[in-house]
Amino acid sequence: MSTALKADTPLYLGIDGGGSKCRAVIVSADQQILGEGLSGPANPLRGMKVATDSILTATQQALSSAGLAFNDMSRLIAGAGLAGVNMPQYYRLFSAWQHPFKTLHLTSDLHIACMGAHQGLDGAVIIVGTGSCGLAEVNGQLIEVGGHGFPYGDNGSGAWFGMQLLHKVLLSLDQLAPPTQMTTLLLQELAASNSIEVVSHFMQATPTTYAKYAPLVFIAAEAGDATALQLVRQGAEFISAIADRLLSIAPPRLSFIGGLAHKLLPYLPEHIQQQVTPALQPPELGAVWFARQRSQLPSSVMSL
């Protein structure tokens, strides 16, 4: 057995729990990545059981990938950055969860994204995935923007683009708005032929469902569709406003992460594009940084 896998060696678990996916990584005390896992949404707004099941599934995959047993879950010093726990009621729910880990240190997905992007140093990060939000920290000054959840916020996010796509397609099908290539793309994707079939598909839609169809907006925009281009530019304006707010405190680095980040970047103003630098590490490794920091504090300390 390697030193990293000995029973008395600390093991760290990093969890990045977003609105669509949950990523887990197990890291040894000497910072070797031992195993990784991937599962479904871990946002408690979707329900505690959904979120905790996703965390446990991703963790079990990471254990298996690392050659560890299920019982080794109790050895893990876990750091979890979850979408939704910026809301006090969900933070309390997760804090009371009877988890199977050695310890669980809880924070937001935005916090671990920033820690990973800048390896724990000052900087700013914007998430453009299922949701949208941003955070900057400079010399102890903290700015957090967004993170209010869909449909109340998350402008410029995957869920927002998917919802706007649906609105525009339905208007076009009713001949209340100009034709758009997005109609053809969505009908093909859903194997639908009319507005009733489209609406039926979305009747129980979650933010993840809407976000799934966001790429269709960009496909149409890249083909020159005027309606899609208008939507992309509107979404880019929302994200640009977040960036300008964060840049107001002059963070030394700005990184974008999330499934739509690379699609939106070309539509952002030049002064923002020039500030963007690649994230140094992914959010799940930011969660490991967080766990390592917090495990040096009293075990009762858990903080956003």
Region roles according to the model:
Residues 89-93, 115-119, 136-139, 267:
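Short, conserved acidic/polar surface loops in the N-terminal third of protein domains
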Residues 86-88, 112-114, 133-134, 261-264:
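Short, active-site-adjacent cap segments at secondary-structure transitions
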Residues 79-85, 128-130, 251-261:
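Glycine-rich beta-strand-to-loop/alpha-helix junction loops that act as flexible
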Residues 43, 59, 63-106, 118:
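Short beta-strand-loop/turn "lid" adjacent to the catalytic site in phosphate-handling enzymes
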Residues 103-112, 127-128, 276-285:
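Active-site nucleophile and cofactor-binding loops and adjacent substrate-binding regions
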Residues 37, 98, 102, 142-149, ...:
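Glycine/charged-rich beta-loop-alpha catalytic/anionic-binding loops adjacent to active sites
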Residues 1-71, 116-122, 166-304:
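ATP-binding/phosphotransfer module of carbohydrate and carboxylate kinases, centering on a glycine-rich
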Residues 121-172:
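Glycine-rich phosphate-binding loop of actin/hexokinase-like ATP-binding domains
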